[in-house]
Amino acid sequence: MDGALTISQALHSAIAQGVARLEAQLLLLHVLGRTGQERAWLLAHDDQALAGTEQQRWREALVRRVGGEPLPYITGWAAFYGLDLQVDARVLCPRADTETLVDWALTLLPSMPCVIDLGTGSGAIALALKHQRPDVHMHARDLSADALAMAQANAQRLGLDIAFSQGAWLEGLTETFDAIISNPPYIADADPHLAALTHEPLQALTSGADGMNDLRAIITQAPACLKPGGWLLLEHGYDQAAAVRQLLQVNGFVDVQSRQDLAGIDRCSGGRCAAETDR
């Protein structure tokens, strides 16, 4: 990569090292100080040479991406449900599959609902719901002070009113909610896939020997914090849907069901807190 490196050469170098074309384009746009919406600009200027400082920043960014660091950590931004969220290594990178959880919640919420997002991280779920439904009284909770700081910064920048609190799941809460929503840690402690996730916070990923410790805790605590007829919606692992549905049923939830992610895998499961009309 010595000499005058053109935009075309930079992209081809990244792709040759295993970086997906779209990610290579977004990474280069970041280095050039342009937005992710300017991919067409790259095509129109593919023979333009990078300045010396740009080449150095490109090399550094490419080394990080080839080394497995998630693109949002390098650029500092992640897109989720039409929102641009600030992210770094303090929080899990928002995944497109988690938008399934937001889609589902939006179909269930009554007028002016009270909703809580547990383990909010960057604030992705809470902010998406508040943005789509301004009438929602939105709460967001996380055990990590670092994660809460990032979520609060995102909320302030986006002008979205969220009530934040620090704590472990629903412990100590006295409010009741129309919906409890969470994308908790659900990877088993010894899962071999963790090797590919070393840049992300471990506490946001793993949950005991079977990956279900936090799911069990939330499902057990939720009935006391849900209004009659309120919903608990959870994201979980690709092979955990049946176990989560069983836990929901054992804990008295009705209308227990799952929703599929973008790959057609049962990725979210939930149930409704029984109301008087269900008895």
Which residue ranges define each predicted feature?
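Mobile active-site "lid"/loop adjacent to the S-adenosyl-L-methionine
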Residues: 185-214
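Flexible, glycine-/basic-rich loop-and-beta segments that form/coincide
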Residues: 275-279
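Non-catalytic accessory regions of SAM-dependent methyltransferases
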Residues: 1-48
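Conserved SAM/SAH cofactor-binding pocket of Class I
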Residues: 93-194, 217
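Conserved AdoMet
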Residues: 29-104
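Active-site beta-alpha loop architecture of Rossmann-like, nucleotide-cofactor-dependent enzymes
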Residues: 72, 187, 239
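Conserved Class I SAM-dependent methyltransferase catalytic core
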Residues: 210-272
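Conserved beta-strand segments of alpha/beta enzyme cores
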Residues: 84, 137, 161-163, 254-257
